[in-house]
Amino acid sequence: MLSIIIPTKNESKLILKTLLPLQKLRKNKTCEIILVDGNSSDSNIKIAKPYVDKILISQSDRSIQQNIGASVCKNNLLLFLHADTKINLKDVENIILQNKKITWGFFKIKFDNNKKRYRFLEFFINLRSILFKYGTGDQCLFMSKEFN
């Protein structure tokens, strides 16, 4: 089982694009979705409410929001997902299947824009991540709860 933790602040224009694809996993009971909101002033919470399992309110600080979400989740495997990030469900299903073997990881980044400069940027972000075993939040970091 997987807990997907999504820190948000004023994401009402983007949040459904992130949450709707995850509903298949939620329906199959293979994940819980926790939204930790940083005191949004828009309709982010209202829009997200039907599509998440828990909504928590926190100060607006991504690391604090992620830690709060991790502290209340019920599963051992955590995935931190930015509210503006689309994720490949097949990749998520693969990490769920390998749950007991995973300590931490990240996905390769791919931008929606196909211009050369974005292809160049994603290539070097992914290369850096592979060479230095270093992922960023935009790459959907995942880890076991016990990982230090």
What are the residue ranges of the model-derived segments?
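Short, well-formed alpha-helical segments that are part of the catalytic scaffolds
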Residues: 10-25
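Conserved nucleotide-sugar donor-binding
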Residues: 74-75, 138-148
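Conserved donor NDP-sugar-binding/catalytic core segment of glycosyltransferases
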Residues: 90-117
